[in-house]
Amino acid sequence: MTDNINIVHKKLFNVIDANFTKILKLKGVVNDIDDNGKFLTIKTLDTERTLKCRTKDNFTKVDVGDVVDVVGNLQLDSNDLSNIYLDLKYLSKQSTFDPSKALSIHNKLLVYLNEHEKVSKVVKKIHKKSLPKQIYNVALIAFPTGINLVNTFKTEFKNKCVGNLYTFYMDTDKTDVSIVSALEYFRKYRNIDIICLLTDQLNIMETCKLSSKEIAKVFLSRKNCPYILSIVSDSSEKNPEPITALLSNKKIETTLAAVNFISEVQWEYRQKVNRAVDLVKEKFYIHMDKKIKKLQQYEVLIWNLNKTSPPINSTDNLKNLLRNKMTEEFDRLNRIETELVNNIIMSDPIQKIVNNIDMFDSNIFMKIVDSIIDKMKNDKAQDKSLATTIKENALRQNLAFQSGQVDINKSRTLQDALVEEMKDHITQDPYLNYKERDENDIVDP
């Protein structure tokens, strides 16, 4: 049961959070301020309803009975679900403001900017400033009362543009100081490409505060400042455009149009970059083709120079191959001969001579040799030739013969057959018997 209540409680809070996200702008009279300075109660001027307000800042500038402008969204008290309060984002005490006097100052300044020769030239120069080719870092300056427009700008910018967006809220009580500070900050830091003045849907007081002489001087004398885009609409005689709109580099209507303008500039820049990349690729390939043709010409030139030297034909190549093959066969025969000689040296009669080499005597040596030869001749079971006897002794020293126990006559016959077959192979091979053939008889394999 407890789990079900917690689930319902959580869902209720989610619904309330979703429905209470809308920003409210209200004007009312302060009825009460709590002791901690965190909550106050206002009575709205239009509906005369009482509403509890909460802020993180102390209400040191506000007293009971003051007329205030508040901006915030509704919140539900987590401790008491029946208690709803306004979480303030902005609070301003309404000062004594004379609209007619403020409009008179605004109109005089507007006439001066348009009709004074030197000043009008400066204004025209401001309007002719070229738009940045690339827009990536964008600054947004607005009044706290325009928080809904700021949220709209952020959403559209995220969906349509790329880059970084920095937001600055002006102080309504010190508009001239705050906007000058914002321009100076964005001029020095963040590498801002364009500044958007969100002056859409202003009231008469906000319009006149943006039309002071101090702000006009700063806008006219600014140097190395980012491109300024003013968003203005709904102007009339009773509520005209602020002076900042005239002194901006460009004016545009509505927040959505401003975001679309930035998006178009970014798209055009991407198109220019893509065209530049394609052009560089095209020039690169053209240059590469020219270099390839030039290398081919050099190749032909070198080929023509080589015509004076003796050409290398296929016959010479074949001769080289045959020589290499003959060298390999010759090395193989030398290895066979070396092995036979080693076997002969390791035979018992020769080892007797080696073992007695220290007391060598020529007479004794000749007697030993004669006795070996006589023994070979008197051996009736074998061939009486000395060469055959040496072969047999070599075969007896061969490890393969000793392990196989093959008949000595068959082994000798097999050895002679292998030697004869090798001779025939060398004689009959057209690639090895090169000394006995004319080079014209050699055919291409």
Swiss-Prot record:
Source superkingdom: Viruses
Name used for this protein in its record: Uncharacterized protein R369
Organism per entry: Acanthamoeba polyphaga mimivirus (APMV)
